[in-house]
């Protein structure tokens, strides 16, 4: 293959006409290579090389990330290379070409032409420009400065290209020689636009060298346009610099306090035309100055500011540095759009890849949302409450993973996803900068700098849509997450009979499940308790208070008395599904959702206003209403007896559309059981992952072993006047009135016989003073 060298390239580099690849991407020949050692770090290897354009020779320094090319023999004397990234800088009076990235066009070739050392360039001021390797000179302070400069990541070895599954929107994946300029920015700079995997840092900035203006008479002001350099060329050694980039993300302005005082801070992320990303941080007065000026999606010219090592615990961008702006920094908006700078850049990994990734890694992932849970409120260790919403994401790798949204994501993107799923649409979701965690399997969670894109318009999303419509709906997926968490803990759909059959709650940790059931009965003799209203931070104390007898209430925890107490729900409910019934307890938030009225208002209706009719009407509306109950099931010790207690942590009205999809999904998983999408249970009790368990085995017969179960719920001495009527149900259906099988108590022929006043009669109550709907006796409200 015949390769021509770029004529005159060395002369232009020596004269300062060409300082970076933005001005020219020359093809040169390496005529000599020599290994040198840095004086301050002898263990660090560097290679100095001599470059030729066929006429002149010039010294260059190879980036340390390219040392392997020399060691492998890919780069050697005689090799012809294309300098895809370089910086020409003056060190101790000599202009040195620092090459952090190059492309080897030909490994070995005869020396082309008869190159000689170049003449003295403008900046040299009479210094000798002869090409020779001098050990003393190589270890001088000037070279030491170069040796300190080391790109943070490996560059492309022979042919730069975007690695892995990374993508940008839009982005080119092949080199191009198209030049571009942005007239509105006032810089008039042309550069080559090609996409490649960029290094994180570059040693020196290509600034107009001051000596070029020497001997030209007095100059009052330098009116030269700013020299724009790539983001990845920035380093702590950069002096005057200007970058042109798009804001891809902006954090909120936050207040902070430390031993040095209080302050405020915000940051934003930048992306330039070469795919370089960097974070910019502003503090205090600088934050006030620039916060309103920065808008996500806009283009800016940013100059001045200091570079410091990136704090990788908080900064996920692929750059070893971040910018800190100060009072001397300038930000100028570019009002004319530059299509060469993408709006977003992704480095997608498949869900299958996540399985082998480490905990706390930051990942970009894209997939189809197959299901989503409602928003729940989680109380953190510091007492603050935060919303949480979970969804399942699947892709073409045959794997699915739980994605957990926190904070504002739940109400914005989360609500939109919920609406799409409820309407029968399976949207595409792209997650940028999600954090991997290993709690209950692999999960992906949002962090402060995460971004969510619903049905985005780029190639990966279109491929996923086509795959899902073509075959993805019926393809089984293995979940990397153990269970689908919808209420802050491991949360799976179960039947009431499974609570007893599977002995849920008896392990060291509680079980968190969802049960779709109907409220059969409510106990209302003590439906609320008096609570402390004193605020503890942003939450009320809510501990029980006692009446002092003088119109005040005392809280032992707060050690204070208050003039007025609060009232909070503590409801005892009996719920039933198609397999069994049980007792549960619902506290304040869940109680208000069920009753539709606050505990205080209901207390006043019953005890202050004595409005029995209104009270009964409220109760009547609640009875025989179906909900999705999210339960915490845990065994507790009461009076030296072990008892399993179920507490309602969240209650949602039944969404028939979503529930139908859940049923259909469960049926699909049953059909694809052989593909390991679900664990196979020969006893027919595999309701995990939203699979409905009817108690019928694969042979079509009921499993007699499922009839055996232990007692659950309240004991007789705690169950009101009639004791505990709730025997286990399991796979068989039996009547609680006559004890026979084949029908439920609500349809029992014996239930029509007159009973004692207020006795439970299989779904309705009948008293000697007459019967009425709603499942509660008029004279015995609050007793079983």
From Swiss-Prot:
Subcellular location(s) of the protein: Nucleus
Domain of life (superkingdom): Eukaryota
GO biological process, one term: DNA replication
Alphabetized Gene3D superfamilies for the sequence: Nucleic acid-binding proteins
Major localization class: nucleus
Bias (Polar residues): 132-148, 167-190, 695-707
InterPro entries noted in UniProt: Euk_RPA1_DBD_C, NA-bd_OB-fold, NA-bd_OB_tRNA, Rep_factor-A_C, Rep_factor-A_N, REPA_OB_2, Rfa1, Znf_CCHC
DNA-binding stretch(es), residue numbering of this chain: 241-327
Gly residues bias locations: 760-776
Annotated SUPFAM superfamilies: Nucleic acid-binding proteins
Region (Disordered): 114-224, 678-707, 746-784
Record key words, sorted: DNA damage, DNA recombination, DNA repair, DNA replication, DNA-binding, Metal-binding, Nucleus, Zinc, Zinc-finger
GO cellular component: nucleus
Zinc fingers classed as C4-type: ranges: 532-558
A GO term, aspect molecular function: DNA binding
Subunit relationships: Heterotrimer of RPA1, RPA2 and RPA3 (canonical replication protein A complex).
PANTHER family noted in UniProt: REPLICATION FACTOR A 1, RFA1, REPLICATION PROTEIN A OB DOMAIN-CONTAINING PROTEIN
Similarity-based family: Belongs to the replication factor A protein 1 family.
Free-text function comment from the UniProt entry: Component of the replication protein A complex (RPA) required for DNA recombination, repair and replication. The activity of RPA is mediated by single-stranded DNA binding and protein interactions. Probably involved in repair of double-strand DNA breaks (DSBs) induced by genotoxic stresses.
Protein name: Replication protein A 70 kDa DNA-binding subunit E
